[in-house]
């Protein structure tokens, strides 16, 4: 039975039992605290935990999962894999232990004809929770009395294996696991408590029945009492069941994985033997083939779900998977790109249950192939240096130094895991501690540079002293002006007691309505005034956490520490910034609505009237897609959605599905901004309008790449959007006047005009080349004997480009024959001079080198250049020096 048929049979069985079939969620977890969905139950956590009411009483799914904690073990054993599929059935306050156990037994043991998997009941074992005096006798009784499993095939295990919790206070409960006996050749008799190689776990049934009040570890927790609603969460490993039903030795030989393994073996010219014995001569290659088979499938599925290679987070996991697969192939002798041969094989194996991998394969393959090419360049540049370093370290009988590992990372792009892997293969350890210390030092330098940019100074001691007096209280969420007092004055980062008119200062208030630049939102500006003085605030930064520093200039009077002030934010500018920030959230939600949840935020910036938003996406957006996004955004604005902000514990925010920027550090309490409830829900500390209609309108300006796998959209909002559209309308009107057509025909007329222009330019190029060719014969007569060679120097004037100049020079060199000859030509293109020199073999034998002559002439022209001894070219900036440049070449040749 094919894996996809096993999965479909699972869904059909539970659908017939009244379960709602829930499609697999993306591999990308909605929980910002984890990279990927690592288990089938993760998408159901809000329901299982009781934080949200489930929209169904029973559900079933086949969930895509990624786990990379044991990535280094992949291939070395036949049980570890990074991508897997978890079949699950869930009950939310409906059936409990007896229902879950009965369903599991029926599906596993019913015949194929009756819709089951047809497993031999005598080969199935069960475990139940037993830990000292705590025993799940209810589950044991169901297995024994209801199902009929002999007592000797029901074994008890403790908290470590048979009790589930979230790792924090909340729901928990005992588990019951189902094991399959693979047979005597796989190990000892005695059940799973004796040998989990022979007895393989296929299904785990979790009975959520307790409320845990404290969880200190997996085996140390307190049970507060029973849950009001008891839930069921089960998970069956699809690949493990496929292995059993397909009669193969391990997951690498199942129908979704083996084709890639075979294709890799054929490409490398290797025979796969399935060995896991390190002493076996085939072991190293078998491990590599298993790595390739696993990682190629994982990469395919990750890219399909919107992950793109990068140096952090999910993108780094994908990058590592691709690079490990490519390197495994190289270690088997395959140095050319291998993904074009292997990725389509994985697509064919997976498309039956996941049609998106075929529908989107053009994008998937483009991303994967580009990453492979990039990695091959990295290997080519860094491997030689690593080999040298390994040899030197071995000669000194020392590990590879942290400094060397850091240099490989910083200069050649070698990630530390690749250095560790390659060094280990050479039998050498790496000073990871030293490497980490240098990486930390680099980060600290970068952070110091960032702080210096924010404060204008490297020395932050004065700011830290002010912070010790108390944090800045921000009042700007609820008011735009208010009373305060000056707590600190600085100039050039140094404390001062007072400042007078015209002086640039940094000012710290006890409390302020001014928003300091943070979270992608630009700082407020405005005025701070007091008795006899006015200060203009130009910027607000936080050089140290919790301290707002106002960069300002004294416009009137004299100001001193301790003065009472009135701080007033520029209201119009703040409102425009709020329009942009709420607009950013709307664009984010619109991207998710049109592209899907994989369009993850990578960064954003918003200021008065303008926003930009960076997101993960592997290709450019079509004009139609951009229009859809813009329409969704403006519908949200027109609908006048309410914008609400709430502070809450971060766990509660996660449970609500609030989006966050992965990698950001959030405190235990966070601020959640909601637009129309769940339409948009994000963690955000910025300022916002109170209803979306206050934005007015939003106009996308365009979209572009900002690094591999990441895109950027920009937009105007409010009056800036209106002004932009008005300017566009005026431009269209002007163009219709120029082109003498209505606006509906403008694109066609401009296209036709450009086509004619290109045709004319092409004809001019042809005529110019023909003219040069015709003139070549006459030009050869201008060659003069200079020293030991015949030298032809000539300025051709306006020319199409360097290629034309080169073509003419080579033609002239050929016409001058085999005696020593040098051709030196100059020309002008786009108001800049060019020079090209060509020498024949006899001239080079006489000591004339084209590269040296071009370097000399280009220097005269105010530029540079060079090349080989036979042909070289250069350029400059001073067209008027062309005669002098040719004269310099003449003198240099004469001197040889």
UniProtKB/Swiss-Prot annotation:
Q: Which CDD domains match?
A: AlaRS_core
| Record SMART domains | tRNA_SAD
Q: What class of enzyme is it?
A: ligase
Where is this chain's protein located in or outside the cell?
Cytoplasm
Example of a GO biological process term: alanyl-tRNA aminoacylation
What EC number is given for this enzyme? 6.1.1.7
Gene Ontology molecular-function annotations: alanine-tRNA ligase activity; aminoacyl-tRNA deacylase activity; ATP binding; tRNA binding; zinc ion binding
Give me the Gene Ontology terms describing cellular component.
cytosol
Q: Which domain of life is it from?
A: Bacteria
The residues forming the signal peptide are none
InterPro entries in the cross-refs: aa-tRNA-synth_II/BPL/LPL (IPR045864), Ala-tRNA-lgiase_IIc (IPR002318), Ala-tRNA-ligase_IIc_anticod-bd (IPR018162), Ala-tRNA-synth_IIc_core (IPR018165), Ala-tRNA-synth_IIc_N (IPR018164), Ala-tRNA_ligase (IPR050058), Ala_tRNA_ligase_euk/bac (IPR023033), DHHA1_dom (IPR003156)
What keywords is this UniProt entry annotated with?
A: Aminoacyl-tRNA synthetase, ATP-binding, Cytoplasm, Ligase, Metal-binding, Nucleotide-binding, Protein biosynthesis, RNA-binding, tRNA-binding, Zinc
UniProt xrefs under Pfam families: DHHA1, tRNA-synt_2c, tRNA_SAD
Q: What is its main location?
A: cytoplasm
Q: Which cofactor does it need?
A: Zn(2+)
- Describe the reaction catalysed, as an equation: tRNA(Ala) + L-alanine + ATP = L-alanyl-tRNA(Ala) + AMP + diphosphate
Cofactor note text: Binds 1 zinc ion per subunit.
Q: Tell me the residue numbers annotated for binding Zn(2+).
A: 581, 585, 684, 688
- What's the entry's take on its domains? Consists of three domains; the N-terminal catalytic domain, the editing domain and the C-terminal C-Ala domain. The editing domain removes incorrectly charged amino acids, while the C-Ala domain, along with tRNA(Ala), serves as a bridge to cooperatively bring together the editing and aminoacylation centers thus stimulating deacylation of misacylated tRNAs.
Q: What does this protein do?
A: Catalyzes the attachment of alanine to tRNA(Ala) in a two-step reaction: alanine is first activated by ATP to form Ala-AMP and then transferred to the acceptor end of tRNA(Ala). Also edits incorrectly charged Ser-tRNA(Ala) and Gly-tRNA(Ala) via its editing domain.
The family annotation for this protein states: Belongs to the class-II aminoacyl-tRNA synthetase family.
Protein's name according to its UniProt entry? Alanine--tRNA ligase
Query: Which species is the source of this protein?
Result: Renibacterium salmoninarum (strain ATCC 33209 / DSM 20767 / JCM 11484 / NBRC 15589 / NCIMB 2235)
Gene field: alaS
């Amino acid at each position: 039975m094919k894996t996809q048929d096993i999965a479909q049979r699972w869904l059909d069985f539970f659908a017939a039992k009244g379960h709602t079939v829930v499609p697999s969620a993306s591999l990308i977890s909605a929980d910002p605290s984890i990279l990927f969905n690592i288990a089938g139950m993760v998408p159901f956590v809000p329901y299982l935990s009781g934080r949200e009411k489930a929209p169904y009483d029973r559900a079933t799914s086949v969930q895509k999962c990624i786990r990379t904690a044991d990535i280094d073990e992949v291939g070395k054993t036949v049980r570890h894999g990074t991508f897997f599929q978890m079949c699950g059935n869930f009950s939310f306050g409906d059936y409990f232990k007896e229902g879950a156990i009965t369903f599991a037994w029926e599906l596993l043991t019913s015949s194929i004809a009756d819709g089951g998997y047809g497993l031999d009941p005598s080969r199935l074992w069960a475990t139940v929770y037993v830990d000292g005096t705590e025993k799940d006798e209810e589950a044991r009784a169901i297995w024994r009395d209801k199902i009929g499993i002999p007592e000797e095939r029901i074994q008890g295990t403790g908290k470590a294996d048979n009790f589930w919790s979230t790792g924090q206070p909340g729901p928990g409960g005992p588990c019951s696991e189902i094991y399959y006996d693979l047979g005597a050749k796989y190990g000892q008799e005695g059940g799973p408590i004796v040998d989990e190689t022979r007895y393989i776990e296929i299904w785990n049934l979790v009975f959520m029945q307790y409320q845990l009040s404290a969880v200190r570890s997996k085996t140390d927790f307190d049970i507060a009492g029973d849950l009001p609603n008891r839930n069921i969460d089960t998970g069956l490993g699809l690949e493990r069941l496929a292995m059993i039903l397909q009669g193969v030795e391990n997951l690498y030989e199942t129908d979704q994985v083996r084709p890639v393994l075979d294709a890799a073996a054929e490409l490398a010219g290797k025979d796969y033997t399935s060995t896991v014995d390190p002493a076996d001569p085939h072991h190293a290659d078998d491990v590599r083939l298993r790595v390739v088979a696993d990682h190629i499938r994982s990469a395919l599925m990750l890219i399909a779900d919107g992950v793109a290679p990068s140096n952090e987070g999910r993108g780094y996991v994908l990058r590592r998977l691709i690079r490990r697969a490519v390197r495994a192939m190289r270690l088997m002798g395959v140095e050319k790109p291998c993904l074009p041969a292997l990725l389509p094989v994985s697509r064919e194996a997976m498309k039956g249950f996941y049609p998106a991998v075929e529908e989107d394969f053009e994008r998937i393959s483009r991303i994967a192939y580009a990453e492979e090419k990039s990695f091959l360049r990295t290997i080519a540049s860094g491997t030689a240096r690593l080999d040298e370093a390994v040899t030197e370290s071995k000669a000194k009988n020392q590990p590879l130094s942290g400094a060397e590992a850091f240099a490989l990372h910083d200069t050649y792009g070698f990630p530390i895991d690749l250095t560790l892997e390659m060094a280990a293969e050479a039998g050498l350890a790496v000073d990871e501690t030293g490497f980490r210390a240098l990486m930390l030092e680099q980060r600290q330098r970068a952070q110091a540079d960032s702080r210096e940019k924010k404060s204008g100074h490297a020395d932050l001691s004065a700011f830290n002293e002010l912070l010790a007096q108390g944090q800045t209280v921000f009042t700007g969420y609820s008011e735009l002006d208010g009373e305060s007092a000056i707590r600190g004055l600085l100039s050039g980062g140094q404390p001062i007691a007072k400042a007078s008119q015209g002086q640039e200062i940094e000012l710290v208030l006890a409390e302020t309505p001014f928003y300091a630049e943070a979270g992608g939102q630009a700082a407020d500006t405005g005025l701070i005034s007091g008795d006899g003085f006015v200060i203009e605030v130009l910027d607000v930064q936080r050089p140290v956490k919790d301290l707002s520093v106002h960069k300002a200039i004294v416009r009137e009077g004299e100001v001193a520490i301790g003065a009472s002030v009135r701080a007033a934010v520029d209201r119009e500018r703040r409102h425009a910034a709020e329009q942009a920030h709420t607009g950013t959230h709307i664009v984010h939600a619109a991207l998710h609505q049109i592209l899907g949840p994989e369009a993850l935020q990578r960064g954003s910036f918003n200021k008065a009237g303008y926003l930009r938003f960076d997101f993960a996406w592997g290709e450019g957006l079509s004009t139609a897609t951009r229009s859809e996004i813009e329409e969704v955004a403006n519908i949200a604005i027109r609908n006048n959605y309410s914008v609400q902000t709430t502070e809450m514990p971060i766990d509660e925010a996660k449970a609500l599905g609030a989006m966050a920027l992965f990698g950001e550090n959030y405190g235990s309490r966070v601020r959640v901004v909601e637009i129309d409830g769940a339409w948009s829900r994000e963690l955000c500390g910025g300022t916002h309008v109170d209803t979306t209609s206050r934005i007015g309108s939003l106009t996308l300006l365009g979209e572009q790449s900002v690094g591999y796998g990441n895109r950027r959209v920009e937009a105007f909002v409010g009056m800036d959007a209106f002004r932009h559209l008005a300017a566009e309308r005026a431009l269209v009107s002007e163009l219709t006047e120029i082109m003498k057509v209505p606006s509906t025909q403008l694109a066609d007329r401009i296209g036709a005009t450009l086509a004619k222009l290109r045709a004319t330019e092409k004809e001019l190029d042809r005529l110019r080349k023909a003219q040069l060719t015709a003139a070549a014969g006459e030009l050869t007569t201008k060659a003069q004997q200079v020293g030991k060679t015949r030298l032809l120097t000539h300025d051709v004037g306006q020319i199409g480009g360097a290629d034309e100049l080169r073509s003419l020079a080579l033609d002239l060199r050929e016409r001058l024959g085999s005696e020593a000859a040098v051709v030196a030509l100059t020309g002008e293109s786009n108001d800049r001079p060019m020079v090209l020199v060509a020498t024949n073999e006899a001239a080079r034998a006489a000591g004339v080198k084209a590269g040296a002559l071009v370097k000399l002439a280009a220097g005269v022209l105010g530029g540079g250049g060079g090349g080989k001894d036979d042909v070289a070219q250069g350029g400059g900036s001073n067209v008027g020096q062309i005669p002098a440049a040719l004269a310099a070449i003449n003198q240099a040749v004469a001197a040889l």
